[in-house]
Amino acid sequence: MYQPDFPTVPFRLGLYPVVDSVAWIERLLEAGVRTIQLRIKDKRDEEVESDVIAAIALGRRYDARLFINDYWRLAIKHRAYGVHLGQEDLETTDLKAIQAAGLRLGVSTHDDMEIDIALAAKPSYIALGHVFPTQTKQMPSAPQGLAQLASHIERLADYPTVAIGGISLERAPAVLATGVGSVAVVSAITQAADWREATAQLLAIAGVGDE
């Protein structure tokens, strides 16, 4: 049963781009995206604070669900919609502080054991990956594939879920057919020949999410 310790999110978050700049946040919100994540890696808080502030302001302007990856202190300070954490971040993050601030929490998982760990934290949603081979980041685990993804979805039942990893425009319908609530994409948009067209097509497939 879906009873998170954090504020709830819709079962369907819709198309969920993960991008590394405020410029991409603005472009995609203007294009109609309503769930998005700012993921800037390996910088100090003070180096990214201005970007976090700008991204959160854009999220508010477009009434969007904007998640900040990793920089949870800044997300709390500037009142983001939510925070997304990797497994390695769970042990070093003050989850109670995120909870007390009223922010949503998403957690990455790669196998059943990590799903168990995520469920223990009772987050707002659980991300499942990587589904297909991906060039976006180095992954220590093997791709799960659609059958394993479907198995995870069946196990998680009514828990909001996000599939991530190597999801292209062509693969998105099959991913959604597993019952997953939403699809996260990176290069399918940022490396597309025409990002506007790619975004429009992905929105037509995955939607903007439930209210």
UniProtKB/Swiss-Prot annotation:
Pathway given in the UniProt record: Cofactor biosynthesis; thiamine diphosphate biosynthesis; thiamine phosphate from 4-amino-2-methyl-5-diphosphomethylpyrimidine and 4-methyl-5-(2-phosphoethyl)-thiazole: step 1/1
Cofactor binding note from Swiss-Prot or TrEMBL: Binds 1 Mg(2+) ion per subunit.
Molecular function GO labels: magnesium ion binding; thiamine-phosphate diphosphorylase activity
Keyword Plastid attached: no
Known catalytic reactions: 2-[(2R,5Z)-2-carboxy-4-methylthiazol-5(2H)-ylidene]ethyl phosphate + 4-amino-2-methyl-5-(diphosphooxymethyl)pyrimidine + 2 H(+) = thiamine phosphate + CO2 + diphosphate; 2-(2-carboxy-4-methylthiazol-5-yl)ethyl phosphate + 4-amino-2-methyl-5-(diphosphooxymethyl)pyrimidine + 2 H(+) = thiamine phosphate + CO2 + diphosphate; 4-methyl-5-(2-phosphooxyethyl)-thiazole + 4-amino-2-methyl-5-(diphosphooxymethyl)pyrimidine + H(+) = thiamine phosphate + diphosphate
Positions with a binding annotation for Mg(2+): D70, D89
Record-listed 4-amino-2-methyl-5-(diphosphooxymethyl)pyrimidine binding positions: Q37, L38, R39, I40, K41, N69, S108, K137
Source species, domain of life: Bacteria
EC id: 2.5.1.3
Gene3D superfamilies: Aldolase class I (3.20.20.70)
Keyword Transferase included in the entry's annotation: yes
InterPro entries xrefs: Aldolase_TIM, ThiamineP_synth_sf, ThiamineP_synth_TenI, TMP_synthase
Keywords: Magnesium, Metal-binding, Thiamine biosynthesis, Transferase
Cofactor(s) needed by this chain: Mg(2+)
Binding site residues for 2-[(2R,5Z)-2-carboxy-4-methylthiazol-5(2H)-ylidene]ethyl phosphate: T134, Q135, T136, G166, V186, S187
GO biological process assignments: thiamine biosynthetic process; thiamine diphosphate biosynthetic process
GO CC annotation, single: cytoplasm
Pfam families (alphabetical): TMP-TENI (PF02581)
Described function: Condenses 4-methyl-5-(beta-hydroxyethyl)thiazole monophosphate (THZ-P) and 2-methyl-4-amino-5-hydroxymethyl pyrimidine pyrophosphate (HMP-PP) to form thiamine monophosphate (TMP).
Family, per entry: Belongs to the thiamine-phosphate synthase family.
Protein name (Swiss-Prot/TrEMBL): Thiamine-phosphate synthase
Species of the source: Salmonella agona (strain SL483)
Underlying gene: thiE
